[in-house]
């Protein structure tokens, strides 16, 4: 009888402890494949060479829009370091990771830049004038002041942000400003990031949808990124800008398995070459692939533009 009572008590105690243990265990991500230093050196050399680039807009490293605080990644699709190695440029939608605000994303960014040669771009906004900022000791508000001085001050603030956060350039999202304002801003950036500026290795990029940026910006722009979303019928064609500076981006938000990106990767102008191709919402292609490989479409597009050399 005593033995039966003892077994019953132990059983009930075990069940009680099991019931209390409701905290789910943290899932360990499968480790990424590690490569030799020779591989990474070859990767950095490739990205430093003249080739058609892959440019992506990536947001899943950060909390969802409107949320704040730290995000605990649930998969490599939510990690910067999980992006394909051969991507050249990553536009950081949703802000800029810092050691204080997003420690995992920040460390991923630093490691990816140093080890893989990937460059990271600040998303500047030329779609509206709701910008309040301070630069050179003076506060500006573009919603009420759109003078040449204020527009050029915004460009300096953008450049200052890029430098202070250790990023590699700025992308002006041209979807609302008039052409003269964009021209002033890009010309001002050239004074800082251009060949005669203090930071000549920083990039100046303009992405656009329906209205083409003024050709007056051509001497100062490293890349024009055309929002060539296939569901809206957009296609290739530099719209008056140099072909070698034009990058065509599909939207994986609408076409997560690739859409027109393979055609953009294969297309070439009659003479010379295009700047490259890429995708908005590249994270949507992490799971949605036709071949079962994470980011399968973007990997295939890179191979179409720049086939791997046979050993």
Predicted regions and their residues:
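Bacterial Sec-dependent N-terminal signal peptides
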Residues: 1-50
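Structured C-terminal cap/extension of enzyme domains
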Residues: 277-279, 307
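C-terminal helical cap(s) of enzyme catalytic domains, especially alpha/beta-barrels
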Residues: 287-311
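Chitinase-like catalytic core of GlcNAc-active glycosidases
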Residues: 49-264, 274, 282-283, 288-292, ...
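Residue-identity detector for glutamine
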Residues: 23, 30, 34, 41, ...
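Solenoid-like repeat scaffolds
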Residues: 268-269
């Amino acid at each position: 009888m005593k033995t039966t009572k003892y077994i019953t008590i132990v059983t009930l105690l075990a069940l009680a402890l099991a019931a209390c243990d409701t905290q789910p265990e943290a899932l360990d991500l499968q480790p990424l494949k590690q490569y030799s230093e020779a591989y990474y050196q070859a990767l950095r050399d490739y990205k430093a060479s003249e080739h058609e680039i892959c440019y992506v807009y990536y947001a899943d490293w950060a909390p969802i829009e409107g949320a704040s605080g730290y995000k605990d990644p649930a998969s490599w699709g939510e990690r910067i370091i999980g992006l394909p190695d051969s991507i050249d440029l990553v536009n950081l939608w949703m802000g800029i990771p810092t050691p204080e605000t997003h420690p995992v994303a920040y460390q991923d960014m630093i490691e990816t830049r140093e080890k893989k040669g990937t460059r990271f771009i600040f998303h500047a906004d030329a779609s509206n004038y709701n910008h309040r900022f301070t630069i050179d000791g003076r506060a500006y508000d573009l919603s009420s002041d759109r003078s040449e001085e204020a527009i050029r001050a915004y460009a300096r603030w953008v450049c200052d942000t890029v430098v202070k956060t250790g990023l590699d350039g700025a992308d002006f999202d041209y979807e609302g400003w008039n052409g003269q304002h964009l021209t002033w801003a890009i010309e001002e950036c050239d004074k800082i990031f251009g060949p005669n500026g203090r930071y000549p290795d920083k990039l100046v990029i303009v992405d656009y949808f329906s209205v083409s940026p003024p050709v007056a910006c051509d001497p100062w722009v490293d890349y024009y990124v055309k929002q060539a979303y296939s569901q809206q019928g957009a296609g290739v064609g530099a719209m008056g800008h140099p072909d070698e500076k034009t990058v065509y981006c599909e939207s994986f938000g609408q076409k997560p398995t690739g859409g027109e990106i393979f055609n953009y990767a294969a297309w070439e102008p009659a003479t010379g070459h295009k700047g490259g191709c890429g995708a908005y919402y590249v994270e949507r292609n992490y799971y949605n692939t036709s071949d079962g490989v994470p980011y399968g479409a973007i990997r295939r597009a890179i191979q179409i533009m720049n086939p791997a050399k046979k050993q």
